[in-house]
Amino acid sequence: MNIRRAVPEDAEAISALIMGLAQHFLLEPSGKGAERFFTGVTPQAIRTYISHPRFHYLVADQGAALLAAAALRDGCHLFHLFVAPSHQRRGIARSLWSAIRAAAAPDAMSLTVNASPNAVAVYQRFGFVVVGPRQEVDGIAFIPMQAPASAQAF
């Protein structure tokens, strides 16, 4: 497995990965109400994130296969962390998290994530704690979490 900076050519595969996992955090299986989310994970939107200086976007791949993707926004918010179902529970999320954490802004006091309810335990293992109640916004359910930027989680 190789972790590297995402390039615009990765956008199609990243978008497909995220869309394939969407049923795990959508409020409605049909996607009703999540139009804003869907707009934000199109290949064009992903290309914009990859190219924008506010984002640090990484992928994990093996040969030509994209296994996972992660993005840090503004040096302190874990914006995306998705692993293909066939490669979950193999340490890929942890490896991406380590690489993303290393890219955090030097002055960041904490890192945040809006965790999918089924991913809370994973983020807790990474050192995050729940900082607010479950929220439902734009057709998506999430739980706000925070981790100290300087602490070694794991």
Locations of the language-model features?
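Conserved GNAT-fold acetyl-CoA-binding loop/helix
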Residues: M19-A45
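A short helix-loop-beta-strand connector motif used in the catalytic cores of GNAT acetyltransferases and
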Residues: P43-L58, H77
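A short, internal acetyl-CoA/4′-phosphopantetheine-binding micro-motif in the GNAT/acyltransferase core
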Residues: L81-Q88
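A short beta-loop-alpha structural element at the N-terminal edge
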Residues: N2-A16
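Conserved GNAT acetyl-CoA-binding A-motif
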Residues: A104-N118
